[in-house]
Design a protein with these regions (language model features):
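A short SAM/SAH-binding and catalytic strip from SAM-dependent methyltransferases
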Residues: 114-127
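Short alpha-helix
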Residues: 190-208, 214
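A short acidic, Gly/Pro-enriched loop at the edge of an enzyme's catalytic core
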Residues: 105-115
Length: 247
């Protein structure tokens, strides 16, 4: 029996909303890391002001940076709880962002000049369908996926993860993230355990996007590593990349 994937995913993120920004690697609050992400947006987005749809916007990290750069941003997320946090941040900063509650596969009509996402594609039950829907609302635009290699069950990965967890416990580091998706949900997420960007690139191409380019985000990786005290930075570093394509 196939679970209610959207309902399960929505409930999971609603439950995580109040803790999300306190979890390691989620919020873009460090100035050096924010500068790296700002530079990435400048590289890959059309010149401002452009109409940008941020899919899976969460608590608004990327939406806020894009708005700061002068773009007209629409933030889409399945979780009302996550968007509530994003709205509060936007109000505090005076950022004019439109917020829409909904699934990635059913974006608002647009049209948009660019569709962006950060660490969201792995949560999609049908990535090709979602990417196709994004192309429909950005018929002359581009898509920018900011992703990473989060999967991996090899012995080295397990050892690193164990050491990181031990260091956090010893140091008493706060991380209220309430754990991984239920296994019954993960089994239905095609990109949940990818260890290379190839499956993301293949899904983008299968959705009809063209001129697909892949770029390693070494500046973002370095900034994220510097954010963490030694030795957590090197231990938690993962390859990150941008996948950019045209409609």
């Amino acid at each position: 029996m196939v679970p209610d994937l959207h309902g399960s995913i929505r409930d999971w993120w609603d439950a995580d909303a109040h803790h999300y920004d306190r979890s390691v690697g989620h919020a873009i609050s460090d100035p050096v890391e924010a500068a790296a992400w700002r530079a990435a947006l400048r590289r890959f987005l059309p010149a401002p002001p452009s109409r940008v749809l941020d899919v899976g916007a969460g608590t608004g990290s990327l939406s806020l940076l894009a708005a700061e750069l002068g773009h007209e941003v629409t933030a889409l997320d399945l979780s009302e709880g996550m968007l509530d946090r994003a709205r509060r941040k936007a109000e505090e900063r005076g950022s004019a962002i439109s917020f829409v509650v909904g699934a990635a596969e059913a974006p608002p009509d647009g049209p948009f000049d660019a569709v962006i996402e950060r660490h969201v594609a792995w949560t999609l039950p049908d990535p090709v369908a979602a990417f196709s829907a994004w192309r429909a609302v950005a018929p002359t635009g581009r898509v920018v996926l900011f992703e990473g290699s989060w999967g991996g069950e090899g012995p080295l990965v397990k050892v690193k993860d164990g050491i990181v967890a031990l260091i956090h416990r010893i140091r008493g580091n706060a991380d209220d993230h309430h754990g991984p998706y239920p296994e019954v949900v993960v089994r239905h997420l095609p990109l949940a355990a990818t260890t290379t960007p190839a499956p993301f690139v293949d899904a983008v191409r299968a959705a009809g996007w063209r001129a697909v380019q892949l770029e390693r985000l070494l500046d973002v990786e370095w900034a994220a590593e510097q954010r963490e005290p030694w030795p957590l930075g090197p231990l938690t570093r993962r390859p990150r990349y941008a996948i950019v394509a045209e409609a």
